């Protein structure tokens, strides 16, 4: 059988492949086509209940209820920022909470989704890192975040979701298999049918997994939370850099580009008295020479401990000028959703 035999422990039906569903129905004396129907309801139609499956008989729906559950997420609380950004506090089936964000602009709507409850890493400037990792999200929990934000985009902005960034809670490359299964569902014609080129995975820099991403021929875009191109500084603000130093990261990124020819985006915050010197900017310029890239200079979004402060505008301008003079594409990115703690680095389940 393709489900748990203990009646009080029903299996989440979305853990089954389409082929497993087809075999289940054949074993129950039905046609394999019924499995295809159910699979379509679960993914492309994102059904949250077996009762939603209106082209399936009541008897079959009851049989599904007897054997399976659909562990869908629930938007427990939605907050709207003065700039239009929406933050969802998402309740999981085990009562844990993650957050996801809809970021609207004039031309697009972007979903910022979470991959873990908490985070595996220990970036000192990030509110999520203070939570520590409780567990990885499974593929359907990631998928459901995207579906919820797509629905909100259509409802509030009258257009479908256009882009997805894995920049919410968690380090996506530390939940590699589930993240990639979710991406597969999101991009499949049997799922949401989104182009993988509209999906960006943002990592703090896990060299081994960046190489695996390249070997697996992922068509997504890659962003790296860099924040310093000097090991002594990066280790101070991102302690895991002691294990995964910049030399290893550089090698992995060179490997990524050699396999994919896809340009990398570096996310970079300039902090007062941490990385706001010409020496820091020069180190970034040198690091950018290794592979084709662009740099996003990001406004810092403060968290409660107050240990980090945004550098003066002159420091950001110095970075921008130096990068541009060296032929490196650079964008100064304004934060969205700050007033509801929805901006980059602020997701900490405060609304839960």
UniProtKB/Swiss-Prot annotation:
Disulfide bonds join 112-344. Binds 1 [4Fe-4S] cluster. The cluster is coordinated with 3 cysteines and an exchangeable S-adenosyl-L-methionine. This is Probable dual-specificity RNA methyltransferase RlmN. The gene is rlmN. GO terms for cellular component: cytoplasm. Specifically methylates position 2 of adenine 2503 in 23S rRNA and position 2 of adenine 37 in tRNAs. GO terms for molecular function: 4 iron, 4 sulfur cluster binding; metal ion binding; rRNA (adenine(2503)-C2-)-methyltransferase activity; rRNA binding; tRNA (adenine(37)-C2)-methyltransferase activity; tRNA binding. The active site is at residues 99, 344. It comes from the Bacteria. Gene3D superfamilies: 1.10.150.530, Aldolase class I. GO terms for biological process: rRNA base methylation; tRNA methylation. The keyword Methyltransferase applies. Its EC number is 2.1.1.192. It catalyses: adenosine(2503) in 23S rRNA + 2 reduced [2Fe-2S]-[ferredoxin] + 2 S-adenosyl-L-methionine = 2-methyladenosine(2503) in 23S rRNA + 5'-deoxyadenosine + L-methionine + 2 oxidized [2Fe-2S]-[ferredoxin] + S-adenosyl-L-homocysteine; adenosine(37) in tRNA + 2 reduced [2Fe-2S]-[ferredoxin] + 2 S-adenosyl-L-methionine = 2-methyladenosine(37) in tRNA + 5'-deoxyadenosine + L-methionine + 2 oxidized [2Fe-2S]-[ferredoxin] + S-adenosyl-L-homocysteine. InterPro entries: Aldolase_TIM, Methyltransferase_A, RlmN_N, RNA_MTrfase_RlmN, rRNA_lsu_MTrfase_RlmN/Cfr, rSAM. It comes from Christiangramia forsetii (strain DSM 17595 / CGMCC 1.15422 / KT0803). [4Fe-4S] cluster binds at residues 119, 123, 126. The keyword Glycoprotein does not apply. Keywords: 4Fe-4S, Cytoplasm, Disulfide bond, Iron, Iron-sulfur, Metal-binding, Methyltransferase, rRNA processing, S-adenosyl-L-methionine, Transferase, tRNA processing. Belongs to the radical SAM superfamily. RlmN family. It is an enzyme of class 2 (transferase).
């Amino acid at each position: 059988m393709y489900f748990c035999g203990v009646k009080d422990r029903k299996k989440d039906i979305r853990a089954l492949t389409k082929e497993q569903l087809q075999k289940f129905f054949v074993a129950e004396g039905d046609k394999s086509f019924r499995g295809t129907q159910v699979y379509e309801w679960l993914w492309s139609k994102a059904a949250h209940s077996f009762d939603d499956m209106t082209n399936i008989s009541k008897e079959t729906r009851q049989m599904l209820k007897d054997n399976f559950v659909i562990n869908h997420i629930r938007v427990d609380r939605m907050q709207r920022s003065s700039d239009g950004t929406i933050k969802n506090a998402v309740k999981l089936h085990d009562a844990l909470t993650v957050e996801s964000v809809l970021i609207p602009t004039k031309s697009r709507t972007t979903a910022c989704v979470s991959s873990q409850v908490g985070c595996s890493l220990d970036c000192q400037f990030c509110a999520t890192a203070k939570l520590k990792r409780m567990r990885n999200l499974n593929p359907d929990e990631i998928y459901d975040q995207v579906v919820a934000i797509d629905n909100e985009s259509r409802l509030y902005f009258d257009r479908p979701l256009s882009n997805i960034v894995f920049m919410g809670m968690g380090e996506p490359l530390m939940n590699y298999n589930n993240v990639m299964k979710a991406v597969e569902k999101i991009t499949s014609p049997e799922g949401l049918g989104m182009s993988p080129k509209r999906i960006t995975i943002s990592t703090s820099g896990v060299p081994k997994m960046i190489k695996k991403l390249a070997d697996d021929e992922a068509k997504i875009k890659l962003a790296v939370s860099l924040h310093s191109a000097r090991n002594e500084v990066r280790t101070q603000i991102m302690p895991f850099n002691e294990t995964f130093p910049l030399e290893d990261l550089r090698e992995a990124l060179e490997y990524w580009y050699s396999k994919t020819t896809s340009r990398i985006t570096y996310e970079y915050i300039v902090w007062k008295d941490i990385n706001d010197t010409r020496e820091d900017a020069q180190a970034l310029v040198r690091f950018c020479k290794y592979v084709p890239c662009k740099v996003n200079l990001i406004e810092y979004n403060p968290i409660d401990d107050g240990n980090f402060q945004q550098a003066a505008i002159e420091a950001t301008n110095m970075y921008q000028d130096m990068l541009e003079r060296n032929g490196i594409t650079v964008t100064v990115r304004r934060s969205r959703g700050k007033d509801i703690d929805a901006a980059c680095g602020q997701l900490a389940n405060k609304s839960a």
